[in-house]
């Protein structure tokens, strides 16, 4: 921001997937370090961000643990441990260094993250997606319930993308009008579908 050719009055961050976790981490660390830019941050948009993790990483970690218990399958467990720190952060949605410090990131462990709310004084928006279309019929409500809990956008469940958690302390306080669910859309399609762009424009224009 200091190198920008003119003075920056306000900053908006548009993030996708793990980029949202990085943005939350950066906001917290910058505030603790006394940096100036968090005061310029006015809007923060999350698209498909796994605020509370992604089941696929947890399943992968469980499989890796099973493989490591048997001598004959242990070499395959070593392959599973090639996963990057960023990928293992997806297990629960780690944001702060303290969330993984002094822990073996490949070991199965309960969610021990520090509670971190959304940055204060910033308008935050959450876009979540589900691969299930609106649909009709007697099983429509069942399909939607399963999608909310399990499928989501194919990587991130709806509840995780919306910051919802069974522990109220961990639920992120997105205003209802700042949440939007895209139907019939997967994780990567959030980056290119016109419906998403229209919603972002509506939010950001309304916030100016």
How would you label these PLM feature ranges?
Residues 1-11:
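Conserved acidic catalytic loop of the alpha/beta-hydrolase fold
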Residues 28-208:
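Helical cap/lid subdomain of alpha/beta-hydrolase-fold lipid enzymes
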Residues 1, 23-32:
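Short, well-ordered amphipathic alpha-helices
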Residues 14-19, 23:
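Gly/Ala-rich beta-loop-alpha elbow adjacent to hydrolase catalytic centers
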């Amino acid at each position: 921001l200091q190198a920008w050719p003119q003075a920056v009055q306000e900053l908006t961050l548009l993030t996708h997937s793990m980029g949202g976790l990085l943005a939350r981490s950066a906001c917290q660390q910058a505030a603790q370090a006394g940096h100036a830019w968090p005061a310029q941050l006015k809007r923060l948009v999350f698209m498909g961000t796994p605020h509370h993790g992604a089941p696929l990483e947890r399943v992968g970690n469980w499989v890796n643990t099973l493989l490591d218990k048997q001598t004959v399958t242990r070499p395959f467990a070593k392959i599973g441990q090639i996963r990057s720190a960023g990928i293992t952060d997806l297990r629960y949605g780690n944001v702060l260094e303290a969330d993984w410090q002094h822990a073996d990131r490949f070991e199965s462990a309960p969610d021990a993250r520090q509670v971190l709310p959304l940055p204060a004084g910033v308008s935050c928006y959450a876009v979540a997606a589900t691969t299930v279309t609106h649909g009709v019929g007697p099983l429509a409500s069942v399909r939607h319930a399963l999608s909310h809990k399990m499928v989501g956008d194919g990587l991130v469940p709806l509840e995780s993308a919306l910051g919802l958690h069974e522990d109220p302390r961990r639920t992120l306080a997105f205003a209802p009008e700042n949440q939007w669910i895209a139907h019939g859309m997967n994780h990567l399609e959030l980056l290119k579908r016109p419906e998403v762009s229209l919603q972002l424009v509506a939010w950001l224009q309304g916030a100016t």
